């Protein structure tokens, strides 16, 4: 920590922060500091795909947040996992590669007044860092004509850092569920990333050769580690941002105060501070710095530097309702892992082949469909698993079963993230307010009816599925909505707490280029910037946002005269 002045300070070494460090430090004249509150991603369970079970709820890798008791969940409080390690949530998540639907980004363009957020404008940013299995040399000849017809030359990329692969195992019970979904009217698909996700099929995942592929591997190691202009601090937590008043009004962010575990260090940014701490921690850091709802800050004795009521508001998340079905005559993870011999066989298969249950994502099969025929588009997502348990961290059930988890892709419920004191070490109050609207409660009930319709199809009949949760005795919409509050849990997709928006939107924290309103030299680049939640898993959209942010930052007029010192681009781009 000999030098405390840098060009760019990146706060948070997770999904967005890792990519930004990679892109900004390519120019040898850019001194880049990465500040990460967690540890290096050297915990072995991070890299074994099934290891998410041992990372969630583990202080080595998780912030261990809890939500406030939630009326929509009948007073329950949920564990709210957030990655506290290099790679952030990409080190502990479900590894599913999902862009979202085209209409998500068309809506962003409308809400921000910026057409660069339209679907056809974000696709290049997705492809920029993509390394897709379909474009591997040994796979090109097998790409179907149907895939080519659907996608033309605007679909996937190769040669980037972000590896996308097929899953390395299949299950008969999941194949039967897919067939049942088709019998229920949901079409088959081999691609959930074409812009219209409706269909049933197997998810693609961010893995490489049977290992989790997190953003620390993809963007930091070894590339950034070998650059003399890049510095990284781990176990270092930002207590607040430093703001300087400007003549004529407004402020400029000049740096941050950082607790290293033994001392408070002040770091300075000559160009920009990039806050990438996630949809929970970024609003907390802003609030601790005097940026946020004035009344909230004053209540905790914090000087109001910029009254932005939207900081910590607009929290959105996907709430998964987990229906569990007992089955007969099916191989499931419950039965495979029920004995020492079974566990040994699972471990041996992974050790020898990097395949089998230890290589699997939490959810293998997915489906996008509509909660009722009147919906104009797919508003439900299924994550189907060949296992069952009462809650993450609990043991698997001792009977053969599968779980059909369904979530409302576009909830209208909105929550908050608010600091609880001026002490940066105290966790913020997280109040998602799930199922707080009549619309969301109706979709919850409808989604359980859809699940039952799928499971009742002939394809699953040989396995004699028996509903274990929520229970066939509950039939009315009112009962099912109430039961959803008893059994539903987060699917770990919080977004929106520092949203982008038009200048006319009083709740917008950022402009469409991630710049904090009224404060120069400060951007927030993470899932909190999303105006609305995407229709699917949120990790890869966050990475796309960081790619666009990097491009905008480097196009600053000050940079134009310095581009000659940038490292040559060695990655190639191949699109299909």
What kind of feature is each model-predicted range?
Residues 1-129, 136, 307-308, 318-320, ...:
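N-terminal glycine-rich phosphate/pyrophosphate-binding loop and immediately adjacent elements
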Residues 1-8, 26-29, 551-576:
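Extreme N-terminal leader/targeting segments of oxidoreductases
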Residues 27-31, 39-43, 241-349, 356, ...:
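Glycine-rich loop(s) and the adjacent beta-strand/alpha-helix scaffold that form part
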Residues 110-253, 322-344:
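Conserved redox-cofactor binding core of oxidoreductases
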Residues 181, 449-456, 547-559:
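Internal hydrophobic alpha-helix adjacent to the cofactor/substrate pocket in enzyme cavities
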Residues 207, 211, 234, 239-247, ...:
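A glycine-rich dinucleotide-binding beta-alpha-beta segment and adjacent secondary-structure elements
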Residues 324-444, 490-496, 504, 524-527, ...:
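FAD cofactor-binding and catalytic pocket of flavoenzymes
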Residues 533-551:
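A conserved FAD-binding loop/helix module that cradles the flavin
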């Amino acid at each position: 920590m000999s030098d405390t002045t840098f060009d760019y300070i990146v706060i948070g070494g997770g999904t967005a922060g890792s990519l930004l460090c990679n892109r900004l430090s390519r120019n040898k004249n850019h001194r880049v500091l990465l500040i990460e509150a967690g540890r290096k991603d050297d915990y072995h369970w991070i890299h074994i795909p099934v290891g998410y079970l041992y990372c969630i709820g583990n202080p080595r890798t998780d912030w261990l947040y809890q939500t406030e008791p939630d009326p929509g969940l009948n007073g329950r409080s949920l564990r709210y996992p957030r990655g506290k390690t290099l790679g952030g949530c990409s080190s502990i998540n479900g590894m599913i590669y999902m862009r979202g639907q085209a209409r998500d980004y068309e809506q962003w363009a409308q809400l921000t007044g910026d057409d660069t957020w339209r679907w056809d404008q974000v696709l290049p940013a997705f492809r920029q860092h993509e390394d897709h299995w379909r474009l591997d040399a040994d796979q090109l000849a097998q790409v179907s004509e149907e895939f080519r017809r659907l996608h033309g030359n605007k679909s996937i990329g190769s040669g980037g850092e972000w590896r996308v692969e097929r899953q390395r195992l299949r299950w008969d019970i999941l194949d039967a569920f897919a067939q049942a979904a088709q019998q229920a009217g949901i079409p088959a698909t081999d691609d959930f990333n074409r812009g219209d996700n409706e269909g049933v099929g197997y998810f693609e995942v961010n893995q490489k050769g049977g290992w989790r592929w997190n953003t620390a591997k993809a963007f930091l190691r070894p590339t950034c580690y070998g650059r003399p202009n890049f510095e990284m601090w781990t176990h270092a937590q930002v207590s607040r941002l430093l703001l300087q008043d400007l003549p004529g009004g407004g402020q400029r962010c000049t740096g941050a105060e950082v607790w290293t575990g033994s001392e408070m260090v002040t770091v300075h940014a000559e160009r920009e501070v990039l806050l990438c701490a996630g949809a929970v921690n970024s609003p907390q850091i802003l609030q601790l710095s005097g940026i946020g709802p004035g009344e909230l800050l004053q209540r905790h004795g914090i000087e109001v530097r910029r009254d932005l009521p939207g900081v910590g508001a607009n929290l959105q998340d996907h709430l998964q309702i987990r229906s569990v079905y007992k089955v007969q005559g099916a191989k499931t993870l419950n039965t495979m892992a029920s004995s020492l011999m079974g566990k040994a066989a699972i471990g041996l298969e992974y050790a020898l082949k990097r395949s089998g249950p230890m290589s699997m994502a939490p959810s293998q099969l997915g489906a996008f469909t509509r909660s009722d025929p009147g919906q104009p588009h797919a508003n439900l997502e299924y994550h189907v698993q060949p296992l069952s348990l009462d809650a993450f961290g609990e043991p698997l059930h001792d009977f053969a079963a599968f779980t059909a988890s369904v979530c409302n892709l576009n909830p209208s419920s909105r929550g908050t993230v608010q600091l609880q004191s001026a002490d940066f070490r105290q966790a913020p109050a997280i109040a998602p307010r799930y199922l707080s609207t009549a619309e969301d409660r109706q979709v919850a009930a409808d989604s359980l009816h859809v699940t039952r319709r799928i499971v009742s199809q002939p394809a699953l009949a040989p396995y004699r599925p028996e509903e274990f949760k929520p229970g066939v005795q509950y039939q009315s919409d009112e009962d099912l909505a109430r039961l959803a509050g008893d059994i539903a849990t987060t699917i770990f997709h919080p977004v929106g707490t520092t949203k982008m928006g038009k200048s006319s939107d009083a709740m917008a924290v950022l402009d469409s280029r991630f710049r904090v309103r009224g404060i120069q030299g400060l951007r927030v680049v993470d899932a909190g910037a999303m105006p609305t939640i995407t229709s699917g898993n949120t990790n890869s959209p966050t990475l796309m946002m960081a790619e666009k942010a990097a491009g905008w930052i480097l196009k600053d007029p000050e940079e134009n005269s310095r581009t000659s010192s940038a490292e040559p681009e060695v990655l190639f781009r191949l699109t299909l």
